Amino acid sequence: MKEYEIHTTVTYTTDGGTTEGSYFVEYVTAKNMAEAKHLLRSELKTAGYKNIRLDAIEV
């Protein structure tokens, strides 16, 4: 298993109905980069984020 640093850009809709953007860094442990991105993307979709862009590097 390897650790990946994933830079994430997403949009989401607030309770007031406006669309906001956010940028953050997550650390994910996975077998490979594709799995790391898949795990994080699934988590973010479940949380209601849209327009998910992920850039990963191995750390």
Region roles according to the model:
Residues H7-T9, K31, D55-I57:
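A structural detector for beta-sheet-dominated domains
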Residues T13-D15, M33-E35, V59:
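Generic "edge-of-domain/loop-turn" microfeature
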Residues E20-N32:
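A short, exposed loop/beta-hairpin motif centered on an aromatic-Gly-Thr core
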Residues E35-E43:
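Low-complexity, intrinsically disordered Gly/Pro/Thr-rich segments
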